[in-house]
Amino acid sequence: MTEPYEGYHGLSFAEEFGPTAFTMMARAEGMRDMGPCLAPQNAWNILHGLETLSLRMEKHCSNALKMVEYLSNHESVAWVSHASAPGHPDKELAEKILPKGTGSMIAFGIKGGKEAGAAFINNVKLASHLANVGDARTLVIHPASATHSQMDEATLKFAGLSHDMIRLSVGLEDFEDIVNDFEDGFRAAKKPLSLIHI
């Protein structure tokens, strides 16, 4: 923003717009790259999604609260991280600023480490093994055996990850269906590695 921008005849956004430089640059580049208005289909998709957002978030948050309780009491789970979880450092703040729910993202540690995490992921069927979040479907990923599998121990730790961590984005399915699916995954994670179908 402080250097002359060739795409705008050498304009320096910082010099020209001062404190609003970032806003002006984002606006100018957005207009250049995407045009001044949405395509009709894109506008319809956004509107269609917004109309049911509050209902979907209610279900996401409800399922997440139940999931935190389920995981917190499960013998195969070492730890649970979610703003509603007992002992979470931000629990009080989250309840104050997010009274209707703290979202559907949960991280938990599976007992048995990397092998158990991989076995769990490969044996759930309802939950999708995907790296994205916020879907209508329940999504799970074991970063140590998937997205971050090339990292050594020190780099994993620096990234805030552990071999036992599973990231969960709770979906809109019936809660009992999610639990039944997770029970299949937990059973597989307890088997000796040679007996696990991966």
List each language-model region with its residue ranges.
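C-terminal alpha-helix
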Residues: D181, G185-A189
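Flexible, small-/acidic-enriched active-site or ligand-binding loops
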Residues: S128-L161
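Active-site C-terminal subdomain of aminotransferase-like
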Residues: M1-M105, G109-R137
